């Protein structure tokens, strides 16, 4: 009975986006998913605005009405981001034999996705230099220590 009264008091509200889940006042009456989506949009918006500002040089700072920058620049950068997402989703085939790999694809350090038969570097003519990468990793992990040039330091 007390639980029904708490329900009717209005502490539980449906999400403001009408997705069917409950929102809370701490998340602006949004459910957790809608709130995360909104936070993601707000965090990427300054990046797009900054990219638009850097892409449009200010030729005449005294006359802001004669801007040569297109107003649709943020949508074009969003379209470029869509191209990147499409390229990532396109890697569902083996780079050597074009066989569908689905979820079992093996990503190589050369950047390709391969099936079980071509997953090893020797099998798909990998262009990645594993020896140089290993040398660089060892050089970063173990910096060269040089001794003092003056032997009789006071």
From Swiss-Prot:
Residues binding Zn(2+) 3, per UniProt: 108, 110, 124, 126
InterPro entries: AN1-like_Znf, AN1_A20_ZnFinger, Znf_A20, Znf_AN1
Binding residues for Zn(2+) 2: 94, 97, 115, 118
Domain of life, source organism: Eukaryota
Segments forming AN1-type zinc fingers: 88-134
Residues noted as binding Zn(2+) 1 in the record, renumbered to the chain: 15, 19, 31, 34
Zinc finger (A20-type): 9-43
Keywords linked to the UniProt accession: Metal-binding, Stress response, Zinc, Zinc-finger
Induction or repression: By dehydration and salt stress.
Function statement: May be involved in environmental stress response.
Name of this protein: Zinc finger A20 and AN1 domain-containing stress-associated protein 5
Gene designation: SAP5
């Amino acid at each position: 009975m007390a639980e029904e009264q708490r329900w009717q008091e209005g502490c539980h509200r449906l999400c403001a986006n009408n997705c069917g889940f409950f929102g809370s006042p701490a998340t602006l009456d949004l459910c957790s998913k809608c709130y995360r989506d909104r936070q993601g949009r707000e965090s990427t918006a300054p990046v797009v605005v900054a990219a638009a500002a850097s892409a449009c040089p200010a030729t005449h700072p005294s006359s802001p009405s004669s801007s040569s920058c297109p107003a649709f620049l943020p949508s074009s950068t969003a379209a470029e981001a869509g191209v990147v997402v499409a390229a990532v989703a396109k890697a569902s085939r083996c780079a050597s034999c074009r066989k569908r790999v689905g979820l079992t694809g093996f990503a190589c350090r050369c950047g390709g996705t391969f099936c079980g038969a071509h997953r090893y570097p020797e099998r798909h003519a990998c262009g990645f230099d594993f020896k140089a990468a290993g040398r660089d990793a060892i050089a970063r992990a173990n910096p060269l220590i040089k001794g003092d040039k003056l032997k009789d330091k006071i």
